[in-house]
Amino acid sequence: MAIDAQKLVVVIVIVVVPLLFKFIIGPKTKPVLDPKRNDFQSFPLVEKTILTHNTSMYKFGLPHADDVLGLPIGQHIVIKANINGKDITRSYTPTSLDGDTKGNFELLVKSYPTGNVSKMIGELKIGDSIQIKGPRGNYHYERNCRSHLGMIAGGTGIAPMYQIMKAIAMDSHDTTKVSLVFGNVHEEDILLKKELEALVAMKPSQFKIVYYLDSPDREDWAGGVGYITKDVIKEHLPAATVDNVQILICGPPAMVASVRRSTVDLGFRRSKPLSKMEDQVFVF
């Protein structure tokens, strides 16, 4: 009987315990993207939330409920669309993080009538799929890699900024300060405003956001008015002399070119056309 009891214990340890671990604790999260792969994978649209007349948040499903996209913070994916028999690609930064999202990922997309990939995404119906590959990009945010991040965003260029801010807000050990200047045309164009304000509420001593509008629709608008100029950057973002500071820029090409010149005028080191992680001014 003693031998049978010993055998039973061995069976429990070898067979039963691993099964309990698997079903009680759950399967290990699996990253779907592989930087070593160069082929595109298909993911179905499972939800679409309309934010403005031409901008929506798109949620795409991953193969399994416990999968994560596998995208380092600050990097982007490449989306492919076949337009008139020709493959066209564009880069997008998901707003979701592996740390807080399983089974899906989210994209903030503004669709243009004359756009290629953005128009294709805007016409997707639930169940339709997109083809993506990645991760790609020269920026990979890590905890406390900078003491102060100055961010300049325009329109959907808020996506990588929001992703980085959310990562900082969720990490109790990350003490990085963030100052964001977010430019738009009208107040209704300010994307993710509630979500951004929620992040500020999580770390009010670290986060500061200033909104600028080209054309305010009301006289009591409390934010800034006009373009994001050198004076705006000087007033709201950290100076070039601040230790371990970095400026991040993402938005329409004209805005990016303008603020990039302004940062050089303000003493920041001029970056090369293709930004690198170590640059004092990084353009997504």
UniProtKB/Swiss-Prot annotation:
Its main location: mitochondrion. Residues 38-142 form the FAD-binding FR-type domain. It is an enzyme of class 1 (oxidoreductase). FAD binds at residues 148-180. It is found in: Mitochondrion outer membrane. Keywords: FAD, Flavoprotein, Membrane, Mitochondrion, Mitochondrion outer membrane, NAD, Oxidoreductase, Transferase, Transmembrane, Transmembrane helix. GO terms for molecular function: cytochrome-b5 reductase activity, acting on NAD(P)H; NADH dehydrogenase activity; transferase activity. Disulfide bonds: none annotated. PROSITE patterns: FAD_FR. Pfam families: FAD_binding_6 (PF00970), NAD_binding_1 (PF00175). Competitively inhibited by NAD(+). Inhibited by mercurials such as p-chloromercuribenzoate (PCMB) and HgCl(2). Enzymatic activity increases under anaerobic conditions. It is a single-pass membrane protein. Pathway: Protein modification; peptidyl-diphthamide biosynthesis. It catalyses: 2 Fe(III)-[cytochrome b5] + NADH = 2 Fe(II)-[cytochrome b5] + NAD(+) + H(+); 2 Fe(3+)-[Dph3] + NADH = 2 Fe(2+)-[Dph3] + NAD(+) + H(+). Induction: Protein levels are highest during exponential growth phase and lowest in stationary phase. The keyword Flavoprotein applies. GO terms for biological process: protein histidyl modification to diphthamide; tRNA wobble base 5-methoxycarbonylmethyl-2-thiouridinylation. GO terms for cellular component: endoplasmic reticulum; mitochondrial outer membrane; plasma membrane. NADH-dependent reductase for KTI11/DPH3 and cytochrome b5. Required for the first step of diphthamide biosynthesis, a post-translational modification of histidine which occurs in elongation factor 2. DPH1 and DPH2 transfer a 3-amino-3-carboxypropyl (ACP) group from S-adenosyl-L-methionine (SAM) to a histidine residue, the reaction is assisted by a reduction system comprising KTI11/DPH3 and a NADH-dependent reductase, predominantly CBR1. Monomer. Component of the 2-(3-amino-3-carboxypropyl)histidine synthase complex composed of DPH1, DPH2, KTI11/DPH3 and a NADH-dependent reductase, predominantly CBR1. Interacts with KTI11/DPH3. Interacts with STE20. Belongs to the flavoprotein pyridine nucleotide cytochrome reductase family. This is NADH-cytochrome b5 reductase 1.
